[in-house]
Amino acid sequence: MCDDEVAALVVDNGSGMCKAGFAGDDAPRAVFPSIVGRPRHQGVMVGMGQKDSYVGDEAQSKRGILTLKYPIEHGIITNWDDMEKIWHHTFYNELRVAPEEHPVLLTEAPLNPKANREKMTQIMFETFNAPAMYVAIQAVLSLYASGRTTGIVLDSGDGVSHTVPIYEGYALPHAILRLDLAGRDLTDYLMKILTERGYSFTTTAEREIVRDIKEKLCYVALDFEQEMATAAASTSLEKSYELPDGQVITIGNERFRCPESLFQPSFLGMESCGIHETVYNSIMKCDVDIRKDLYANIVMSGGTTMYPGIADRMQKEITALAPSTIKIKIIAPPERKYSVWIGGSILASLSTFQQMWISKQEYDESGPGIVHRKCF
């Protein structure tokens, strides 16, 4: 970017984490939990500067005395007041910028309701007075980040997973599939199976501990049955984890039983297909001529695709479903946790993109509906 141009802000609002930074950077400056916390108790000490709400890391660190809420559920914003708090926190506390001076690129879940995009647009222009904004689909940005224009993206975050086939830069909406199974469900499942082991995790604060156990110790088995047998026969797969109070817990087959539910949702009592079948079904909804290109470009993105072993297992499962002659390639870049944000950073700094922004002037003339004409 040249210096006389002002850098655009890129904000990827995930159900679990908000990623924010400046277009042209190679990684987000700020990554914090999409959480708003409110005190459960009455403040008694005067002059402590107690607030009526806390956002992000501060809410996380004071979680013992707060009730934590996530304003984004299953990838879709459900609580606009809290969402506004998160955006305010993003601009003023994390990035320390004045939003009225920068174009803002926001991301949205595939198949986001139309009213939601309008509301996002309205808040950006009316509450934050942004000079320009744009809303991009998360999975499309992940594909940009991998340097492709054609492929199928499996984007699995904290609140929702999607398979989005994209051909020459266009998402194919009729073939997008959504799976309400993602990181948060896996955390809840891990809480459940650890409870069966005799460890009790119940509160919203303890759930965050379990999330940490999941991120540090879980992995995907290449062959689940065989791994279960190994775990039963020896202690080679056991790992220990120290809780904040110093208590040490041991976790064995839970390490791979938890993420196995991505491939077998029946573990969670869900009747849906696993992520491998969902990818396959999504490809099968596309035109027969482009399937070959999709099989050869299966791109993983989002935090829930970070488990060790997930790409190999995916390769194995898709190979079993697809025609035998077809070449299957799984792309799982190491930075895939942030690939939506990175794609946004790339897009917002392209010279060809500059005419795509919705300007404040266009918004004032046409109203929130402008977002459907300019962002597709």
Curated annotation (Swiss-Prot):
EC number: 3.6.4.-
UniProt modification remark: N-terminal cleavage of acetylated cysteine of immature actin by ACTMAP. Oxidation of Met-45 by Mical to form methionine sulfoxide promotes actin filament depolymerization. Methionine sulfoxide is produced stereospecifically, but it is not known whether the (S)-S-oxide or the (R)-S-oxide is produced.
Reactions that this protein is recorded to catalyse: ATP + H2O = ADP + phosphate + H(+)
GO terms of biological process kind: DNA repair-dependent chromatin remodeling; mitotic cytokinesis; ovarian fusome organization
Subcellular location: Cytoplasm, Cytoskeleton
Positions where Tele-methylhistidine occurs in the chain: H74
Propeptide stretch(es), residue numbers: 1-2
Positions carrying N-acetylaspartate: D3
Annotated positions of the Methionine sulfoxide modification: M45, M48
GO CC, alphabetical: actin cytoskeleton; cytoplasm; NuA4 histone acetyltransferase complex
InterPro entries given in the database record: Actin, Actin/actin-like_CS, Actin_CS, ATPase_NBD
GO molecular function, one term: hydrolase activity
Keywords: Acetylation, ATP-binding, Cytoplasm, Cytoskeleton, Hydrolase, Methylation, Nucleotide-binding, Oxidation
PROSITE patterns: ACTINS_1, ACTINS_2, ACTINS_ACT_LIKE
PANTHER family per record: ACTIN (PTHR11937)
Subunit and interaction comment: Component of the Tip60 chromatin-remodeling complex which contains the catalytic subunit Tip60 and the subunits Domino, Tra1, Brd8, E(Pc), DMAP1, Pontin, Reptin, Ing3, Act87E, BAP55, Mrg15, MrgBP, Gas41 and YL-1.
Known function: Actins are highly conserved proteins that are involved in various types of cell motility and are ubiquitously expressed in all eukaryotic cells.
Note: In Drosophila there are 6 closely related actin genes.
Similarity comment: Belongs to the actin family.
Protein name: Actin-87E
Organism of origin: Drosophila melanogaster
Gene that produces this protein: Act87E
